[in-house]
């Protein structure tokens, strides 16, 4: 899995109040299992004890002791990419294809359903690669740790695995040696999909230019075919050894247990000095005589205005991540400059309409070796590019001169306080993600964990010098040169890339002898034979269904009426109150549905009649952890046709600020200025750009939803609210003039607002026992304020026109396809739901993964069954062989009926399902299954027992009943499609 820090911001570390574990205390200088203790540190603000150790081989280990049963482990290596062949990325894939101890094909995917881990993955970052997992089961921890260590340190690295995961030449039809020879490979196709994403293309080209010493770790599809098998093995030998390793553990399992396992592996490894694996630094442009300027070409987005597809950014060096305090200060500056409606750059760049949204690299990036602050815009016209640059510089100069409002600084610090108090069930993973990037680049991991001392120093500096932040800004942003990066849209970009790929293929084919072609055909046959061979998986460790408890404890909930229905979850919350409200939108005419996402976004974007959104946002940040509005459609657990369209409000605040939170909700709900057409147009442009980018990142999700929308009223509404239908709707709105928005859109939003305020609400509150009485009074007052409003519509039942199921292709300028197929299932309480859920998992792991990914070359593919929506789905992700995939899925039901399923197959599917079912959740999520979805404890317990009791005969029966002879079958795909598509069977939408 490719992981890009700047496109996927790391999870903000948040804290659940635990005591530190009672593990034996280690002292500096102690030696345990070959590891010397370098440093230890208590971090009382996070209730943890951190220990940094070093093995005799040079490997470092960071252990975070905390009384948390959700233990985390990771092994990682510094992997500076030597070129753009994607060797770190391909190696990440290939190491997981078998090891000395576990000589089976793809033990990583095999362990996905032999474990109860709530997280398992492998990720390639810009300059390091890591393999993390999390589990609450001690035996599971031991099993997975051994598999991960053996996979990374002792992989088989077979040439056929390299061909499958990296790239290869192969006959298009692997059974016909006369068929054309083409380029294939999982990573090759994954990166073709990535490069089709305009946001990714901008970011990666920017990164290559500002970090010329740091190549594209994911790989450029036009360069990937230059990587050799020998090059892969050498990169592993040079980089995947203990002297270059950093391991991490977190939780209540003893550090000695981890160190003993690591020592046993490290002692049997050859130690080699890793060449050229030092910290990589960006261009030293800050002291150059002139600002550095780079212009590149990139893909266009056909869903956006073709005249507004320029992207640009300006970047400044802002010190080293090794200076923890300085880095904290520049993070504060970055947030104050760009985050939210009250930030000066948001007002000048986005509110002004100069662009649709920030450029993909906007923000502070502290990896790999420098703090780089970037700000820019996308959705810019060519004529405005120079103006954008001038506006950015002038805004920074003005801010340095005038400073930031103290209320904004206080609001930002208040958000950090709330983040620390918020109870997160995946704190260990968040901690790991926060520490690793710096640790791999010589940032002290123990210093990086400190919080109170950094915050205390910042408060003292601000008190001593109110212009402290202005001086830091002047030092880095005014007194230094910047790096200017620009990407111009080229309508022929995808065509040119394809032509270059064709040239690479033609050049390779021209050098082939008849003997080479015969060898290519034989290699393809051997690869397919390897993929088909049954395996003995007895060497792999596994948990058992007996390790899954048949019952889960009931969460203590209270239900009261005051006279409004409230669900209470009374538990320790670190002084926070979590508030939820749901009201039915039944009776809203269906022609208003596409406007609902705009309505909810407007509430936190447009501002009110008396206050700008910037002013309101400052109040929200200073008094709450955020206010959120959303709409969703859900099915009844008892009957799929029974559905509910809901408007929801969610908020969190310190107990002392709950009344203020309700006041802010009132302000937004009653007084939002929907006539603010300039802000509305800006919001539509930003929403369109964001959803368009999501298509290229998660196209399979959009395809699955679109397919389901043809056979389910609930999914039809979901597609209108957040699927392809919403993308197309927003694209149409983005092309409208301000006057058209005034005439056609604003009245709809005003009517929805009036309607939403008439609906009866039900509430859920999670808080401490001592706050129940006070919160009960506040909720009652809040609810009473809505009673006098009348609906502008005649109330009717929820209904929406349906279309005939079909096969739909949304033709998009991608290099690969995304596909979704939907088949009706049953309601949550139906007895067949459990075997359908098990069947989907078995099909994915025992058939579709092999057929779609290993053979077909797609990055991913499988089946899923959503128990609450009652839909069976097939999907593929970044798929070069759409036609083959659709045929495979169509035949999957028959394959399931004929398959001789084993008891092991059944057990593995159940283990895999319960990874998610039994994953730890935060206190704020407890009771939400009942509140949001209407699922009672008794219904969920019955479903649990049904899943555990599913037999092979049940799986075969539902496969025949629902998949072989489905009552409905709908297909949707996003991408270029395939050459032999029957236009009579497909509806093609541009």
Curated annotation (Swiss-Prot):
Q: Where does Zn(2+) bind?
A: 89, 93, 190
Judging by the UniProt lineage, the source's domain of life is: Eukaryota
The enzyme's main class, written as a single word, is hydrolase
State the compartments where it is located.
Mitochondrion intermembrane space; Mitochondrion matrix
A GO term for molecular function? zinc ion binding
Q: What is its main location?
A: mitochondrion
* Enzyme Commission number, as recorded: 3.4.24.-
- Primary role: Degrades mitochondrial transit peptides after their cleavage in the intermembrane space or in the matrix, and presequence peptides; clearance of these peptides is required to keep the presequence processing machinery running. Preferentially cleaves the N-terminal side of paired basic amino acid residues. Also degrades other unstructured peptides. May function as an ATP-dependent peptidase as opposed to a metalloendopeptidase.
Entry's family note: Belongs to the peptidase M16 family. PreP subfamily.
Q: Mind telling me what this protein is named?
A: Presequence protease, mitochondrial
Q: What is the native source organism of this protein?
A: Yarrowia lipolytica (strain CLIB 122 / E 150) (Yeast)
Kindly list the organism's lineage: Eukaryota, Fungi, Dikarya, Ascomycota, Saccharomycotina
From the UniProt record, report the name of the gene that encodes this protein: CYM1
């Amino acid at each position: 899995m490719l992981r890009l820090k700047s496109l996927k911001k790391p999870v903000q570390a948040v804290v659940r109040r635990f005591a530190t574990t009672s593990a034996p205390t280690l002292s500096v200088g102690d030696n345990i299992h070959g590891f010397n203790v370098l440093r230890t540190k208590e971090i009382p603000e996070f209730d943890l004890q951190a220990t940094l150790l070093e093995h005799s081989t040079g490997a470092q280990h960071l252990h975070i002791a905390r009384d948390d049963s959700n233990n985390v482990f990771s092994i990682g290596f510094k992997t500076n990419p030597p070129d753009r062949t994607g060797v770190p990325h391909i190696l990440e894939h290939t190491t997981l294809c078998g090891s000395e101890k576990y000589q089976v094909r793809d033990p990583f995917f095999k362990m996905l359903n032999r474990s109860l881990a709530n997280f398992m993955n492998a990720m390639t970052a810009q300059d390091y690669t890591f393999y993390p997992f999390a589990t609450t089961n001690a035996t599971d921890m031991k099993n997975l740790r051994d598999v991960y260590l053996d996979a990374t340190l002792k992989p088989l690295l077979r040439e056929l695995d390299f061909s499958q995961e990296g790239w290869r030449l192969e006959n298009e039809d692997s059974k016909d040696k006369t068929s054309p020879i083409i380029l294939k490979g999982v990573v090759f196709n994954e990166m073709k999909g990535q490069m089709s994403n305009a946001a990714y293309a901008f970011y990666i080209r920017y990164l290559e230019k500002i970090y010329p010493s740091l190549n594209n770790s994911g790989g450029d599809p036009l360069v990937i075919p230059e990587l050799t098998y020998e090059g892969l093995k050498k990169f592993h030998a040079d980089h995947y050894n203990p002297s270059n390793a950093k391991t991490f553990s977190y939780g209540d399992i003893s550090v000695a247990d981890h160190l003993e396992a690591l020592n046993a592996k490290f002692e049997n490894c050859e130690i080699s000095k890793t060449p050229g694996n030092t910290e990589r630094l960006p261009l030293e442009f800050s002291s150059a005589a002139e600002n550095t300027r780079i212009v590149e070409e990139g893909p266009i987005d056909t869903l956006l205005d073709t005249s507004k597809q320029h992207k640009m950014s300006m970047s400044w060096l802002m010190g080293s991540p090794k200076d923890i305090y300085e880095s904290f200060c520049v993070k504060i500056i970055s947030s104050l400059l760009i985050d939210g409606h009250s930030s000066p750059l948001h007002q000048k760049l986005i509110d002004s309409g100069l662009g649709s949204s920030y450029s993909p690299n906007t923000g502070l990036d502290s990896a790999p070796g420098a703090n780089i602050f970037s700000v820019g815009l996308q959705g810019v016209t060519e004529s405005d590019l120079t103006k954008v640059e001038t506006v950015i510089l002038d805004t920074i100069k003005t801010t340095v001169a005038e400073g930031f409002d103290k209320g904004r600084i206080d609001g930002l610090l208040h958000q950090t306080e709330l983040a620390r108090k918020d109870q997160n069930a995946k704190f260990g993973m968040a901690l790991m993600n926060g520490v690793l990037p710096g640790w791999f680049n010589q940032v002290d991991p123990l210093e990086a964990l400190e919080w109170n001392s950094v915050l205390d120093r910042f408060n003292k500096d601000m008190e001593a010098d109110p212009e402290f932040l202005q001086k830091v800004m002047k030092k880095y942003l005014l007194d230094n040169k910047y790096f200017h990066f620009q990407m111009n849209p080229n309508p022929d970009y995808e065509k040119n890339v394809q032509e270059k790929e064709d040239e690479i293929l033609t050049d390779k084919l021209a050098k082939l002898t008849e003997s080479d072609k015969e060898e290519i055909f034989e290699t393809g046959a051997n690869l397919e034979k390897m993929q088909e061979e049954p395996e003995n998986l007895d060497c792999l460790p596994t948990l058992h269904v007996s390790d899954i408890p048949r019952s889960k404890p009931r969460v203590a909930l209270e239900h009261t009426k005051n006279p409004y229905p409230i669900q209470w979850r009374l538990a320790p919350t670190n002084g926070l109150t979590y508030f939820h409200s749901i009201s039915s939108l039944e009776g809203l005419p269906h022609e208003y549905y596409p406007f609902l996402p705009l309505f909810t976004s407007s509430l936190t974007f447009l501002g009110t009649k008396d206050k700008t959104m910037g002013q309101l946002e400052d109040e929200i940040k200073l008094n709450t952890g955020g206010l959120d509005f959303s709409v969703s459609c859900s099915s009844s657990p008892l009957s799929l046709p029974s559905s509910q369209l809901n408007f929801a409000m969610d908020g969190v605040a310190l107990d002392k600020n709950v009344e203020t939170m309700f006041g802010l909700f009132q302000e937004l709900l009653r007084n939002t200025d929907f006539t603010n057409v300039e802000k509305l147009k800006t919001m539509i442009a930003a929403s369109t750009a964001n959803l368009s980018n999501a298509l290229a990142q998660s196209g399979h999700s959009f395809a699955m939803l679109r397919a389901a929308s043809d056979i389910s009223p609930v999914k039809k509404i979901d597609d209108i609210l957040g699927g392809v239908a919403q993308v197309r709707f927003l694209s149409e709105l983005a092309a409208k003039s301000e006057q058209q928005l005034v005439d056609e859109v604003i009245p709809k939003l005003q009517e929805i607002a009036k309607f939403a305020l008439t609906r009866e609400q039900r509430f859920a509150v999670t808080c401490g026992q001592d706050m129940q009485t006070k919160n009960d009074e506040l909720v009652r007052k809040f609810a009473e304020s809505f009673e006098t409003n009348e609906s502008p519509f005649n109330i009717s039942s929820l209904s929406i026109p349906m279309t005939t199921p079909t096969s739909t292709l949304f033709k998009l300028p991608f290099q690969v396809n995304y596909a979704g197929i939907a088949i009706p299932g049953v309601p949550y309480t139906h007895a067949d739901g459990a075997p359908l859920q098990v069947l989907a998992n078995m099909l994915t792991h025992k058939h579709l993964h092999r057929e779609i990914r290993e053979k077909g070359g797609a990055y991913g593919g499988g089946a899923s069954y959503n128990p609450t929506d009652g839909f069976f789905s097939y999907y593929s992700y970044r798929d070069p062989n759409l036609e083959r995939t659709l045929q495979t899925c169509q035949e999957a039901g028959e394959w399931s009926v004929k398959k001789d399923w084993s008891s092991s197959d059944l057990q593995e599917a159940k283990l895999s399902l319960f990874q998610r079912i039994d994953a730890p959740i935060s206190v704020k999520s407890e009771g939400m299954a009942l509140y949001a979805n209407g699922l009672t404890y008794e219904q969920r317990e019955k479903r649990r027992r049904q899943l555990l009791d599913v037999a092979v005969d049940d799986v075969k029966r539902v496969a025949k009943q629902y998949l072989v002879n489905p009552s409905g079958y709908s297909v949707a795909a996003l991408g270029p499609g395939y050459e032999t598509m029957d236009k009579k069977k497909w509806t093609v939408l541009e």
